[in-house]
Regions:
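Short, surface-exposed loop/strand segments
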Residues: 285
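Intracellular alpha-helical coupling/juxtamembrane segments of multi-pass membrane proteins
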Residues: 223-256, 260-266, 270-281
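ABC ATP-binding cassette signature C-motif
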Residues: 1-233, 288, 293-614
Length: 614
């Protein structure tokens, strides 16, 4: 056992962040901590790292256990070199009698710094290399031998190379197990899937305020759905019992005999339990912020077309001879290391910068472009939240309808009492929601999203994805959130930072190109790629093969059989014996999921065959 939290609680002002939370960390554990913004994840991490103290409960750790904490934001002294930053936190000598300089050299080598980088100013490093330097400082502070590493939002502002390095660093095997146990707060779903061996979600949706699942994020999603479904069924069953109690009580108890008193007490207890479980179910099904981007509803085939564009700054070539077209339904992802030219390409496409060669052709009238930038508009720290949301008056016009600032704020999960509070009191996620609220007020033909995921929690990320899927215009997306790129991008432009680029149909192919100088050639012409629920191929009608026609002839019978299986599975979940047995209920839920998936697959295949036939 490396660390144990026993029934710890913490409040912020009058609001309870979490109550009586318990957690145990053993060697080899890699624990991902998730939850909505404001749930207290970072506070919990600081308590585990002994940076803060809990209001109640205790943290137990053997004295021999060494742990290090890597905060979200780094702080290096002004003018410090890479080596200076690490030496500043290294012990004079470690257990092996190594001096500070040697300890620092080992730390820097371990995180990938070459010797010719040691004298670089820390202030000149990219986000990914600053994270490596923070990690080197943490390792150095304990003589390079931590048992436990705690990280707060470690992938924020990292490029894909930095994220890949961090994943390798945390999962590196030594002696058959991970080199370090780790606990990390993150909203990066792919990172959670690649690294975590256990997921902990802090939320009011669960008894005790926490749900723990062994396995990665994909396993967590499955188990969480089972839990929420089971809790909903439990509420229904309990509500039936309470109704029976009410009928019995309405008849009037004859006296107050011991047996009747017990029944009354049991009824009261059931009502309390029902109230609690309904509150948890409400928390579990909260939809979060209501994100809907507005479009001009223009159906122009091509909104922006780049023909042979190139751009360089001095000898630094960013892209050359690039052809790219943006039309309704397109979502083009831009991928490359920090400094490879993604932001510059956006500026050229949107007319803010002129290309060195080639031309940009726009639709007539010019497309309306709305930009969500990672370098977001700064509000004065004293600006009240209400003014930040509605800068002109106490009302906004959204899709032709006037809304009061109170209603508009609630749409983004802000409480009424927050409207008069300064924006300086908001968390990073709350500020991100303010900026989303601002750009939702502008109707767009083209949405440009430059790192929109920073500071957003997973529920808001998923809502943002849904809204972008439904947006009828074109989208340019710059993000290191691999899950979002995979779900949304119809094409991905890969910039290698040397003036070359390639257009890929999938994220996996784009990552392979980034990771290899000898990657296979990918066609660089601007060919739209089919993306489910986003765009359809513009190919002409296709004649069905004999095999496809046979499949189409028999698919309706298969669909009817699949729907009957779904109905049977639904009926099984209403069986009292199943509801009373967790194992049977889990199996029944799995059968239902599989039946629904098969039905959905057959309907999708039917649509596909009919489209090919027409």
């Amino acid at each position: 056992m490396l660390l144990q939290a026993k029934e710890i609680s913490k409040t912020h002002g009058v609001r309870a962040l979490f109550s009586k939370v318990s957690l145990r960390v053993d060697q080899g554990d890699r624990i991902g901590v998730i939850g909505p913004n404001g749930a207290g994840k970072s506070t919990l991490l600081k308590i585990l790292a002994k940076q803060e103290t809990p209001d109640t409960g205790e943290i137990i750790a053997p004295s021999a256990v060494s742990s290090v904490y890597i905060p979200q934001l780094d702080t290096f002294e002004d003018g410090a070199s890479v080596m200076d930053a690490v030496i500043a936190v290294a012990p004079t000598h470690d257990a092996n009698h190594l001096d500070q300089h040697t300890i620092a050299e080992i730390s820097l080598s371990r995180v990938g710094f070459a010797q010719n980088q040691w004298d670089l100013p820390a202030s000149t490093l990219s986000g990914g290399w600053r994270k490596r330097l923070s990690t080197a400082c943490a390792l150095s502070s304990c003589g390079n031998e931590p048992d436990l590493v705690l990280l707060d939002e470690p992938t924020n502002h990292l490029d894909l190379e930095g994220i890949a390095w961090l994943e390798d660093f945390l999962t590196l095997k030594m002696g058959g197990q991970a080199a370090y146990a780790s606990i990390f707060v993150t909203h990066d779903r792919r990172f959670l899937s690649q690294v975590a061996t256990r997921i902990v979600e802090i939320s009011d949706a669960y008894p005790g305020g926490m749900l723990t699942v062994d396995g990665n994020y994909n396993e967590f999603i499955r188990r969480r759905a089972e839990f929420v479904d089971g809790q909903a069924k439990a509420a229904q069953s309990l509500a039936n019992e309470v109704r029976k109690d009410d009928v019995w009580l309405s008849r009037g108890a004859q006296g107050r005999q011991t047996k009747q008193k017990k029944q009354i007490d049991a009824s009261s207890q059931r009502k309390t339990e029902l109230s609690e479980i309904r509150a948890r179910n409400e928390a579990a099904t909260q939809s979060g912020a209501k994100i809907e981007f507005s479009s001009t509803d223009r159906q122009t085939k091509k909104l922006i077309e780049a023909k042979g564009i190139s751009k360089a700054f001095g000898d630094n070539k960013l892209f050359s001879n690039l052809d790219l077209a943006l039309g309704v339904g397109d979502c083009v992802g831009l991928l490359g290391a920090n400094g490879s030219g993604k932001t510059t390409l956006i500026k050229v496409l949107t007319g803010e910068l002129a290309p060195d060669t080639g031309e940009i052709r726009n639709s007539d009238p010019l497309p309306r472009v709305v930009i969500f930038s990672q370098h977001r508009e700064d509000f004065a720290p004293t600006t009240p939240l209400g003014e930040a949301l509605c800068p002109i008056s106490d009302r906004v016009e959204f899709r032709g309808r006037l809304m009061h600032v109170t209603s508009w704020a609630r749409r983004f999960m802000f409480r009424d009492d927050q409207l008069t509070q300064p924006v300086s009191s908001l968390s990073g996620g709350e500020l991100a929601r303010v900026h989303i609220a601002r750009i939702m007020l502008e109707a767009a033909d083209v949405l440009v999203l430059d790192e929109p995921t920073n500071d957003l929690d997973i529920p808001t990320l998923e809502l943002l994805e849904d809204s972008l899927t439904d947006f009828p215009g074109a989208t340019i997306l710059v993000t290191h959130d691999r899950t979002m790129l995979e779900n949304l991008a119809t094409r991905i432009v890969v910039l290698d930072g040397t003036g070359s680029q390639q257009i890929c149909p999938s994220l996996d192919q784009a990552i392979r190109i980034l990771n290899s100088n000898d990657s296979e050639q990918v066609e660089s012409t601007d060919v739209p790629v089919e993306k489910t629920a986003k765009v359809r191929s513009n190919d002409g009608p296709k004649k069905l093969s004999y095999k496809d026609q046979r499949e189409l002839d028999g698919i309706e019978d298969k669909i009817m059989a699949a729907d009957e299986q779904v109905e049977t599975a639904h009926s099984a979940l209403s069986d009292p014996k199943v509801l009373a047995n967790h194992e049977l209920m889990t199996k029944a839920c799995k059968v239902l999921d599989e039946a629904q998936a098969e039905s959905a697959r057959l309907y999708a295949r039917w649509d596909e065959l009919e489209a090919m036939k027409s």
